[in-house]
Amino acid sequence: MFKNSFQSGFLSILYSIGSKPLQIWDKQIKNGHIKRITDQDIQSSVLEIMGTNVSTNFITAPADPKETLGIKLPFLVMIIKNLKKYFTFEVQVLDDKNVRRRFRASNYQSTTRVKPFICTMPMRLDEGWNQIQFNLSDFTRRAYGTNYIETLRVQIHANCRIRRIYFSDRLYSEEELPPEFKLFLPIQKQG
């Protein structure tokens, strides 16, 4: 999808405020919902993915299973709200051995397991809104001893609220981020 586009800085694949936040995504819903709502903490539109079973409620990009994202930027950053329920996400990458590898992070797992084609790992979320930063290059090297080439697919499962998902060429400090990539909490009125 993005293979032939110039990639530097930031590349956003989901922005909850945009006119069509799920334009490149496919939805799977069973005993749950995927909808845009207003989050009270940030007073803004977010995408909520909820379901009784994390494996049957998710969004995946690209929507076409035969396509790949082709994103070469090595950092995946997600602005996600912890809903104090089971939550998992998965990223499929291509390495320099031309092997497709998957990384799955979950808040209900306690150990990291590396198998030839999938690495599952625990993820700890703070209360409220979180910025998850995932160094795909480093994970690929540490788990498989190979080099990251590109991201093929991203899948976000229940249960969470999403503000934005983007890739970047490096980690940026809060001061360096463009305003639309920051999570602004509303100023509390003193009364």
UniProtKB/Swiss-Prot annotation:
Gene Ontology, cellular component aspect: ciliary basal body; cilium; cytoplasm; microtubule; motile cilium
One GO process term, biological-process aspect: positive regulation of cell motility
Alphabetically ordered keywords of this record: Cell projection, Cilium, Cytoplasm, Cytoskeleton, Microtubule
Highest taxon of the lineage: Eukaryota
InterPro entries: CFA20/CFAP20DC (IPR040441), CFA20_dom (IPR007714)
Chief place where the protein resides: cytoplasm
Keyword Transcription regulation: no
Compartments it resides in: Cytoplasm, Cytoskeleton, Cilium basal body; Cell projection, Cilium; Cytoplasm, Cytoskeleton, Cilium axoneme
Pfam families linked: CFA20_dom
General function of this protein: Cilium- and flagellum-specific protein required for axonemal structure organization and motility. Microtubule inner protein (MIP) part of the dynein-decorated doublet microtubules (DMTs) in cilia axoneme, which is required for motile cilia beating. May also play a role in cortical organization of basal body.
Similarity annotation: Belongs to the CFAP20 family.
Name of this chain's protein: Cilia- and flagella-associated protein 20
Organism, as annotated: Paramecium tetraurelia
Upper classification of the organism: Eukaryota, Sar, Alveolata, Ciliophora, Intramacronucleata
